[in-house]
Amino acid sequence: MDILRKVAEIHGTPTYVYFEETLRKRSRLVKEVFEGVNLLPTFAVKANNNPVLLKILREEGFGMDVVTKGELLAAKLAGVPSHTVVWNGNGKSRDQMEHFLREDVRIVNVDSFEEMEIWRELNPEGVEYFIRVNPEVDAKTHPHISTGLKKHKFGIPLEDLDSFMERFRSMNIRGLHVHIGSQITRVEPFVEAFSKVVRASERYGFEEINIGGGWGINYSGEELDLSSYREKVVPDLKRFKRVIVEIGRYIVAPSGYLLLRVVLVKRRHNKAFVVVDGGMNVLIRPALYSAYHRIFVLGKQGKEMRADVVGPLCESGDVIAYDRELPEVEPGDIIAVENAGAYGYTMSNNYNSTTRPAEVLVRENGRISLIRRRETEMDIFKDVVM
């Protein structure tokens, strides 16, 4: 793609590149699935926290699902109204609660009995509580991002809901919240989880529900079938006066590419390594989840060589892609990593005292905008007290 080469020439590498057109199209697809539903769509800021991208999603009618004060600040910088912010997470401290209340956030997903006790002590006005329940449903995804089983740290078991409601019946509980995991590509886990939670909602007369997210994308083959999701899930949601959904990866991952420059090609015996200028410091997903990302070399085609694409860091796990067929690669070539818009920059790090990458947006009119400058080495140490 010529535009990616142009970005690399202007802004260097490693660089994340996002396409506004794709971002808007994917956000609209989400809303189309829920046609006829009283929907509050929210974007999961953990997937990508750049306020420029969040502003685009705000323009598309999205609120924000946030976990931390930092994610809330990102939403505020994007101009997202407080009444469309949902506070999620399993480790809310009293100090954080007081901060979010000062920022006028009023929709809260409560994760535990213990958390609700703190809310009861604070007794804030106007807070709408959604209780995260654990439906004991296997999402059939990577264990690190599966969240719907009793062994996981999230939510309260459905069988404990009666005692929860009895204990906190004086609180302004508006509905239930369920989120069984991430990168789910089959409809069946959603159907199983939602059927349990919808029945529980009816038992308590709840007219609102938060169904979480978890929609999987096509990294290497299968993507969630939205037509099947619409057919099997959405009809039961139309009875609710408000349905909250939190979608991150599905919207932003296909909108982004990671550009890396080949430093050298290392050959030994029958093994080849293409060494690039960013590894698990800029994209940790392959190292952390054994995640697969399609890659291609700008301006080259063919399958002349088979190699691991590896980063420059001091770990054998510092790998972008294993055993890929590539054209004959040379130092200076640019490799593009697909579906890199989610959990890329937000999980980047300074390991080996490397700098975080730049972020660039390609506007709908084709204009290239720098939306986050590349870190410098001095940025890494600016908070050190000597």
Swiss-Prot record:
<dbReference type="InterPro" id="IPR029066">
    <property type="entry name" value="PLP-binding_barrel"/>
</dbReference>
<keyword id="KW-0210">Decarboxylase</keyword>
<feature type="binding site">
    <location>
        <position position="343"/>
    </location>
    <ligand>
        <name>substrate</name>
    </ligand>
</feature>
<dbReference type="InterPro" id="IPR022653">
    <property type="entry name" value="De-COase2_pyr-phos_BS"/>
</dbReference>
<dbReference type="GO" id="GO:0008836">
    <property type="term" value="F:diaminopimelate decarboxylase activity"/>
</dbReference>
<protein>
    <recommendedName>
        <fullName>Diaminopimelate decarboxylase</fullName>
        <ecNumber>4.1.1.20</ecNumber>
    </recommendedName>
</protein>
<keyword id="KW-0028">Amino-acid biosynthesis</keyword>
<keyword id="KW-0456">Lyase</keyword>
<dbReference type="InterPro" id="IPR022643">
    <property type="entry name" value="De-COase2_C"/>
</dbReference>
<feature type="binding site">
    <location>
        <position position="249"/>
    </location>
    <ligand>
        <name>substrate</name>
    </ligand>
</feature>
<feature type="binding site">
    <location>
        <position position="315"/>
    </location>
    <ligand>
        <name>substrate</name>
    </ligand>
</feature>
<comment type="pathway">
    <text>Amino-acid biosynthesis; L-lysine biosynthesis via DAP pathway; L-lysine from DL-2,6-diaminopimelate: step 1/1.</text>
</comment>
<dbReference type="InterPro" id="IPR000183">
    <property type="entry name" value="Orn/DAP/Arg_de-COase"/>
</dbReference>
<keyword id="KW-0663">Pyridoxal phosphate</keyword>
<dbReference type="InterPro" id="IPR009006">
    <property type="entry name" value="Ala_racemase/Decarboxylase_C"/>
</dbReference>
<feature type="binding site">
    <location>
        <position position="343"/>
    </location>
    <ligand>
        <name>pyridoxal 5'-phosphate</name>
    </ligand>
</feature>
<feature type="binding site">
    <location>
        <position position="285"/>
    </location>
    <ligand>
        <name>substrate</name>
    </ligand>
</feature>
<feature type="modified residue" description="N6-(pyridoxal phosphate)lysine">
    <location>
        <position position="46"/>
    </location>
</feature>
<dbReference type="Pfam" id="PF02784">
    <property type="entry name" value="Orn_Arg_deC_N"/>
</dbReference>
<keyword id="KW-0457">Lysine biosynthesis</keyword>
<dbReference type="GO" id="GO:0030170">
    <property type="term" value="F:pyridoxal phosphate binding"/>
</dbReference>
<feature type="binding site">
    <location>
        <position position="214"/>
    </location>
    <ligand>
        <name>pyridoxal 5'-phosphate</name>
    </ligand>
</feature>
<dbReference type="InterPro" id="IPR002986">
    <property type="entry name" value="DAP_deCOOHase_LysA"/>
</dbReference>
<comment type="subunit">
    <text>Homodimer.</text>
</comment>
<dbReference type="InterPro" id="IPR022644">
    <property type="entry name" value="De-COase2_N"/>
</dbReference>
<comment type="function">
    <text>Specifically catalyzes the decarboxylation of meso-diaminopimelate (meso-DAP) to L-lysine.</text>
</comment>
<dbReference type="GO" id="GO:0009089">
    <property type="term" value="P:lysine biosynthetic process via diaminopimelate"/>
</dbReference>
<comment type="similarity">
    <text>Belongs to the Orn/Lys/Arg decarboxylase class-II family. LysA subfamily.</text>
</comment>
<dbReference type="Pfam" id="PF00278">
    <property type="entry name" value="Orn_DAP_Arg_deC"/>
</dbReference>
<feature type="active site" description="Proton donor">
    <location>
        <position position="314"/>
    </location>
</feature>
<feature type="binding site">
    <location>
        <begin position="246"/>
        <end position="249"/>
    </location>
    <ligand>
        <name>pyridoxal 5'-phosphate</name>
    </ligand>
</feature>
<feature type="binding site">
    <location>
        <position position="289"/>
    </location>
    <ligand>
        <name>substrate</name>
    </ligand>
</feature>
